[in-house]
Amino acid sequence: MRLTALVSGTVQGVGYRRYVQRHARDLGLSGSAENLPDGRVEVVAEGPPEHLERLLHWLRRGPPHARVADVQTQYSEATGLRDFHVY
């Protein structure tokens, strides 16, 4: 399964993408985290549904200096991504 999440709030410049990468890799997920020009972070992750739900918990929490205001999610079929990258 594939999760696409758009995370808004204070999520750029606070280590959010590396935080997501660490938790995604710990869960065995593949995908990416990328800063968007509008201040949000887009997270794409693929793996078992129960692992995606655990990642979603971490997305909503964020690292200490982040302030997550909203997480919009969409689920779709996995496309076979490998590893987890930060852009």
Swiss-Prot record:
<keyword id="KW-0378">Hydrolase</keyword>
<feature type="domain" description="Acylphosphatase-like">
    <location>
        <begin position="2"/>
        <end position="87"/>
    </location>
</feature>
<feature type="active site">
    <location>
        <position position="17"/>
    </location>
</feature>
<comment type="similarity">
    <text>Belongs to the acylphosphatase family.</text>
</comment>
<dbReference type="GO" id="GO:0003998">
    <property type="term" value="F:acylphosphatase activity"/>
</dbReference>
<dbReference type="Pfam" id="PF00708">
    <property type="entry name" value="Acylphosphatase"/>
</dbReference>
<protein>
    <recommendedName>
        <fullName>Acylphosphatase</fullName>
        <ecNumber>3.6.1.7</ecNumber>
    </recommendedName>
</protein>
<dbReference type="InterPro" id="IPR036046">
    <property type="entry name" value="Acylphosphatase-like_dom_sf"/>
</dbReference>
<feature type="active site">
    <location>
        <position position="35"/>
    </location>
</feature>
<dbReference type="InterPro" id="IPR001792">
    <property type="entry name" value="Acylphosphatase-like_dom"/>
</dbReference>
<dbReference type="InterPro" id="IPR020456">
    <property type="entry name" value="Acylphosphatase"/>
</dbReference>
